[in-house]
Amino acid sequence: MGAGPTGLSCAYFLAQMGYPVTVFEALPIGGGMLSVAIPDFRLPLEVIEKEIDYIAKCGVDIKYDTPINVNFTVEDIRDSGFEAVFIAAGAQRSQNIGIPGELEDIEGFYYGLRFLRDVKIGKPVKIGRSVAIIGGGNVALDSSRTALRLGADEVSIFYRRSREEMPVTEVEYDEALAEGIRVNFLVSPTRIANDDWKVAGLQCVHMKLGEPDASGRRRPIPIPGSEFFAPANTVIAAVGQAPDLSFLPPGSALERTRWERLAVDSNRLATNVPGVFAGGDFVSGPGMVIEAIAAGRRGAIAIDKYLQGDTSRVEMYDLKPSVIEEEVTREEEESWEPQFRPETPYLPLQERTGSFKEIELSFSEEKARQEAKRCLRCDLEK
């Protein structure tokens, strides 16, 4: 269930084992968050489509526009003849901010995931001249850079912690700054203001960092008397994502945790219902794409064991071939100077405005050869 990275990974590895696999996907396209939440300037859709086409050619049947809900349940799937079910529905529910004025029917207010998805599938999105983004993760940065490309004159991010706590890479952060995104650290919105049901701006307060909280990051604390108002025509809330369990009918036999996620065995990804497994962001919450792919592979191994009647633990073996070290001799005149990685070329800033062209470009042939030659100095492992 779900044609995102986890579901497709599970389907691929099961198909490689010889099983007939069917994937049910609610949307008209596959790829999950890769297709509908990551903008084209970071990951072009055609790249994902090629990967999905390859998986389909491996024997995986992908049924699009087929949501799992109260009318077509997990139990219905089992009853229709499938011997095992793997739930990989992702974490596609935007978390609420929990402040006054957070109303989806106010003109100019969006949740980050919905905003990115609407833009990606070509749905008309109205953006004001001044855009405020609430949050500090990848969805917040992607939303801010997307808003610029849609024609916003000014885009500002409001993040309640410092740069050190901001969960984005240096590359993504630096690229956003280079494109003109303003980042306001240690600032927390307290209210979304509207004028006649149209976004008017954010009421905010400055913060200071206190002791670490449960996440290990220092807890932001409001500074009394530091309140201020930030005008904006559009507000995009991007403070996190969570799994959406609304497709489960009332009284579903599937057990949940106190965090409202499916309860699974951490090794075998099995739920309390025999033959039903779950994994990826749907179980763990938002993570890295490679972690989602690994969860799909683990799910495939677990399902294979289940169908074979094998109750042993799932072991994830490294698929890399072993390498044997051999001593080599060299001529004295040979250079052993370190060869550094060539810099990745980027689309010039002036070509990014109003364009969703991929900004991280490919190496030229010369640079590619230069990079390949560095492999002659690789550290080998047995």
Model region roles, listed by residue range:
Residues 1-23, 139-148:
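N-terminal Rossmann-like FAD-binding beta1-loop-alpha1 element of flavoenzymes
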Residues 7-9, 15, 86, 281, ...:
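Cysteine-centered iron-sulfur cluster-binding motifs in ferredoxin-type domains/subunits
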Residues 50-70, 94-150, 256-267, 271-272:
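Glycine-rich dinucleotide-binding loop and its adjacent helix/turn
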Residues 188-198, 208, 305-381:
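Mid-to-C-terminal Rossmann-like scaffold of FAD/NAD(P)H-dependent oxidoreductases
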